[in-house]
Structures are given as C-alpha cells and as structure tokens.
C-alpha cells in the first residue's frame, strides 16, 4: 500500500467524519483520479516535439499517455480537425497515490518563487486544477536531456460535493495552499 493511502485511511477519514458529521465512511470524499495534460501547439510544425512531450509525460507519470487530437479546425491557430495537439494521462489506483505523494513532498517544494497554491482553482464540485510551467521540477526529468521547457495541467478529481469539502480533503494531506 502507498504511504499516502494508509494516511488517508487512518487519519484523513476520521478527521473529515468529525468535521462534516458524515453518517458513513462511504460519504467521505476521496481522490478519484489525477489527470496530467500537456498541450503542445508547436507539434503541428514539428512532429518530434510531440514525441519528446510523450517521453517526458511517460517518465513523470510512469504510464504511457494518449495523444489528444483536435476536435475541430481553427484557422487562427493553424489547426485542422484530427491533428495531434497534445497528450494526457489519467492516474488511478496506486499510481494516483504515488504521484500525489510525489507532487506534495517533492515537486511543489521545487517550484521557483513558490508562495502557495491558489484556493480559487476549485471548479465548484471540489475538483482542483493547477498548472505547472516547467517539467524540470520533476525528479525524473534530466535537465541536460530536454529539448525545451514545457508546462502541464494537473487536475485532481474528487467525489466531494462542494469546494469546501474538496479543500478540506486536500488540506488534510498538507496540500500547500496560500495563507
């Protein structure tokens, strides 16, 4: 079992039951999945850029990403329907817990000029999204071997009913929100 999963079972669930007076353990919010998305607009010019992004996302997540394809043509972006425009990976189960542990303990503290994550990034249903500007903050990425710095979006999907429940869930894991 993952260290963070055991922490969730032993500490987070009892604390949230006490705070929100849930009648059942099954009513306690939990993290359902973590989605990592890398949008690469330059991939229409050079196909190698997409391969490098897939390689980076594979190293970061430990899972092979799928290529996202444009749903419709947009002339101003020079995109046609069916063009590859990025890649994404969805983490569930043990990989989800391992990645979340790595995100909290290693990756977020390595962000330059970090002052805490915004509390406004919840979507109204307790899901949290954050953007990372450079992939080199992940320990799996070798700084000397990257072709360019790319960012990514990370979405933490929970089954909580409100932003308050989602925020309390992430706060129990010591997620670094702004004061």
Swiss-Prot record:
GO terms for biological process: translation. Gene3D superfamilies: 3.30.1440.10. GO terms for molecular function: rRNA binding; structural constituent of ribosome; tRNA binding. Pfam families: Ribosomal_L5, Ribosomal_L5_C. InterPro entries: Ribosomal_uL5, Ribosomal_uL5_bac-type, Ribosomal_uL5_C, Ribosomal_uL5_CS, Ribosomal_uL5_dom_sf, Ribosomal_uL5_N. It comes from the Bacteria. Keywords: Ribonucleoprotein, Ribosomal protein, RNA-binding, rRNA-binding, tRNA-binding. One of its GO terms (cellular component) is ribonucleoprotein complex. PROSITE patterns: RIBOSOMAL_L5 (PS00358). Part of the 50S ribosomal subunit; part of the 5S rRNA/L5/L18/L25 subcomplex. Contacts the 5S rRNA and the P site tRNA. Forms a bridge to the 30S subunit in the 70S ribosome. HAMAP family: Ribosomal_uL5_B. This is one of the proteins that bind and probably mediate the attachment of the 5S RNA into the large ribosomal subunit, where it forms part of the central protuberance. In the 70S ribosome it contacts protein S13 of the 30S subunit (bridge B1b), connecting the 2 subunits; this bridge is implicated in subunit movement. Contacts the P site tRNA; the 5S rRNA and some of its associated proteins might help stabilize positioning of ribosome-bound tRNAs. Belongs to the universal ribosomal protein uL5 family. This is Large ribosomal subunit protein uL5. It comes from Buchnera aphidicola subsp. Cinara cedri (strain Cc). The gene is rplE.
């Amino acid at each position: 079992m993952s260290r963070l999963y055991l922490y969730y079972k032993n500490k987070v669930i009892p604390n949230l039951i006490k705070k929100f007076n849930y009648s059942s353990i099954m009513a306690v919010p939990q993290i359902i999945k973590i989605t990592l998305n890398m949008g690469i607009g330059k991939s229409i010019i050079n196909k190698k850029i997409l391969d490098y992004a897939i390689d980076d996302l594979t190293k970061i997540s430990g899972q092979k990403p799928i290529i996202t394809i444009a749903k419709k043509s947009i002339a101003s972006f020079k995109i046609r329907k069916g063009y590859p425009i990025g890649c994404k990976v969805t983490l569930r189960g043990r990989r989800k817990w391992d990645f979340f542990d790595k995100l909290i303990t290693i990756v977020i503290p390595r962000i330059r000029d970090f002052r805490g994550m915004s509390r406004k990034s919840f979507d109204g249903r307790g899901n949290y999204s954050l953007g990372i500007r450079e992939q080199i903050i992940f320990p799996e990425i070798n700084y000397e071997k990257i072709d360019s710095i790319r960012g990514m979006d990370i979405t933490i999907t929970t089954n909580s009913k409100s932003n308050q429940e989602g925020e309390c869930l992430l706060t129990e894991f010591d997620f670094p929100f702004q004061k």
